[in-house]
A protein has these predicted regions:
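Long, highly charged, low-complexity internal segments
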Residues: 39, 47-81, 92, 188-303, ...
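Active-site phosphate-binding and catalytic loops of NTP-dependent enzymes
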Residues: 27-32, 127, 152-157, 178-182, ...
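Short, polar/flexible loop-turn hinges at active-site or ligand-entry regions and domain interfaces
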Residues: 75-79, 106, 126-130, 151-158, ...
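Hydrophobic (often cysteine-bearing) scaffold residues that line and stabilize catalytic clefts
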Residues: 15, 111-115, 160, 164, ...
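Intrinsically disordered, low-complexity regulatory segments
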Residues: 1-166, 170, 351
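Catalytic phosphate-handling regions of large nucleic-acid enzymes and associated NTPases
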Residues: 5, 101, 302-331, 353-375
């Protein structure tokens, strides 16, 4: 009698192999690894997606206004071109009699959930689901994650949100793209995000075209030690040249007296930990990197080097359960240019506060921070080092 097994579905081969290593699945096959307890397989990103309009009938074969809007009663799924081989492997494994349950180990986020659920739906697999939810792919994180697997039902709403996003993109994008193309007899495209972004660009362009600059004037008094700027009740800018000249005439030949000098200490707070958007913004401003370049670099630092946590986060905060790991994370980055700062922090003790630790402000994933994985800076490319440096300096600053 065959032993019951758990099938683990990862999003990419590299992560699947990392998980297989931790679970000691050494029996390598084409597209999966297994042992007497687990089968670890993987997608290649999306293996399954929403079917094109042509799948809903002949009337959608040709682009014309008569067939619009396209509003399928039930959205169909299809295996993506080039993914058929791996889908067949995964589908076959899901159907094996000894596989009694599934662990979804795709990226811990909305799209990762969709990758796995669409595969399960297409394969008509209704076996019990558990979820591996981790923010880094180090051996330690994977091992801890398997000790704390969550019921798949907890993520049903996340799947529904991803499904709504995908179906919304299909309905808006394909209908409007066909309508525009047919109406204007030109290859035009539209989309839920694309069209909204284009509108923002158009509005900005119109504002620039219609902007009418207004001159203003300042009055400066230069001394050997410093420069004084005249300031009235409404600020230092004077809209009228005539008014500026009148003020200047009144001050000519007069002496200024410094009546008081006050010094006040100011405390500047850290800008906070990085989420993906702010990291992309800073990488563009400082290094000229596009958002896609930054994300690709972050994926390598997360998946290949395993030295930063999950990149696709929209939170700048940590949860309380991360706090006990901060000391170990600091010790891991106590190298090279960061050693002195880490030493000072550890000497004074780690103090957390609501400015960066707040469970209520973390939904799927906490802010981007270093993992407990040992770092070898020499193994990083120039661009990887730049992004890593930004994240570590932010981490140290809080």
């Amino acid at each position: 009698m065959s032993q019951n097994k758990t099938l683990v579905l990862a999003e990419k081969p590299s992560v699947g192999k990392d998980i297989a290593h931790v679970l000691k699945c050494k029996n390598g096959q084409n597209g999966y690894l297994e042992n007497d307890r687990y089968i670890v397989t993987w997608a290649l990103g999306h293996l399954v997606s929403l079917a094109d309009p042509e799948a809903y009938g002949e009337k959608y074969q040709n682009w014309n206004m008569e067939s619009l809007p396209m509003l399928p009663e039930h959205m169909k799924l299809t295996v993506l071109k080039g993914s058929g081989k791996q889908y067949k492997i995964v589908s076959s494994l899901l159907g094996r009699s000894e596989v009694k349950d599934i662990v979804i180990a795709t990226d811990a986020g909305r799209e990762g959930e969709l990758v796995a659920r669409w595969i399960l739906d297409k394969a008509h697999c209704h076996k019990p689901i558990r979820r591996l939810w981790i923010s880094s792919v180090t051996d330690k994180a994977i091992s801890e994650g398997f000790k704390n697997l969550k019921p798949g039902t907890e993520f049903n709403n996340l799947y529904r949100a991803a499904q709504c996003r995908a179906e919304g993109d299909w309905l808006v994008g394909l209908n409007i793209t066909r309508a525009l193309t047919v109406k204007y007899n030109a290859q035009l495209s539209a989309g839920r995000v694309q069209s909204a972004t284009l509108n923002m660009i158009v509005e900005r362009e119109e504002a620039i075209k219609n902007f009418k600059p207004k001159p203003y004037y300042n009055i400066l008094a230069k001394t050997p030690q410093f420069t004084l700027t005249w300031q009235g009740q409404h600020g230092k800018n004077i809209n009228s040249k005539e008014t500026a000249e009148k003020i200047l005439q009144k001050m000519k030949g007069k002496s200024a007296v410094i009546k008081d000098i006050s010094k006040k200490p100011k405390k500047s707070t850290s800008p906070g930990l990085y989420d993906l958007t702010e990291l992309q913004r800073d990488a563009n401003r400082l290094f000229g990197m596009s958002p896609k370049e930054t994300l690709n670099i972050m994926q390598r630092l997360y998946e290949s080097h395993k030295i930063l946590t999950y990149p696709r986060t929209d939170s700048k905060y940590l949860t309380q359960d991360i706090v006990p790991t901060l000391s170990e994370r600091l010790k891991t980055i106590s190298i090279g240019p960061y050693k002195a700062a880490v030493s000072e922090i550890l000497k004074l003790g780690i103090h957390t506060n609501k400015s960066f630790v707040d469970d209520r402000k973390v939904s799927d994933h906490h802010a981007i921070i270093p993992t407990e994985q040992r770092v070898i800076l020499a193994n990083l490319s120039t661009d990887e080092r730049k992004i890593y440096d930004l994240v570590i300096k932010r981490f140290l600053s809080v």
